[in-house]
A protein has these predicted regions:
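Hydrophobic transmembrane alpha-helices and their immediate loop junctions
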Residues: 1-194
């Protein structure tokens, strides 16, 4: 969703800034790849296309264009923490909801729709999707951004890779959860508006 869209817009804006032609192109192979990889990671992850860039660029400019997508995801992740924390606090969405860890909650309880659980999960998915998309795109092979960034500057490549790998690893090992992080902000906000 939004993580993918803004990631691609990041590429396009930096490409245009560097005087290149850039537009989104659909890629049926991206869908096939996403379906194939879903068997290994347990959820559907697809790239229906990508921003194609044409023009004379230096290795440095190509690296900047490539890293723009993952850095956009990093920005969306960082902005999402206080933004979703405040939204969830103002709506009282965490009130009475049990912590669900990395994966969602029940949306129906006693025959009633639990909108709070849905809202919490939108925030959780916002954080998780941006981290995972950023990390995935920093892999250094094929058409992914990581190969272009590594070709430009190995120090920058490993720095950005670690910026994504550390929080993803600690998230999946239970050191922190997106839900828990959002609740740290939401609870004081919720207490202020009661």
């Amino acid at each position: 969703g939004p993580a993918f869209l803004f990631h691609e817009i990041g590429h396009k804006l930096v490409a245009k800034k560097n005087g290149c032609w850039a537009e989104f192109r659909a890629d049926p192979k991206g869908l096939q790849f996403g379906i194939a990889i879903s068997f290994f990671i347990g959820f559907l992850f697809m790239a229906p296309g990508a921003v194609m860039v044409a023009g004379l660029v230096t290795r440095r400019q190509n690296g900047h264009i490539a890293v723009a997508g993952p850095l956009t995801n990093l920005g969306l992740f960082l902005i999402g923490i206080p933004l979703w924390g405040i939204i969830l606090g103002l709506t009282g969405a965490f009130n009475g909801l049990p912590d669900a860890g990395i994966f969602g909650r029940d949306y129906v309880s006693d025959g009633s729709l639990v909108w709070q659980a849905m809202l919490v999960d939108v925030g959780v998915y916002w954080l998780g999707a941006n981290l995972l998309l950023g990390l995935f795109n920093m892999l250094p092979f094929g058409p992914l951004d990581g190969l272009k960034v590594k070709d430009w500057n190995e120090v920058a490549y490993f720095a950005v890779l670690l910026i994504f790998a550390v929080p993803v690893f600690t998230m999946f090992t239970g050191v922190w959860t997106p839900s828990g992080m959002l609740q740290i902000i939401a609870d004081p906000v919720s207490n202020l508006v009661r």
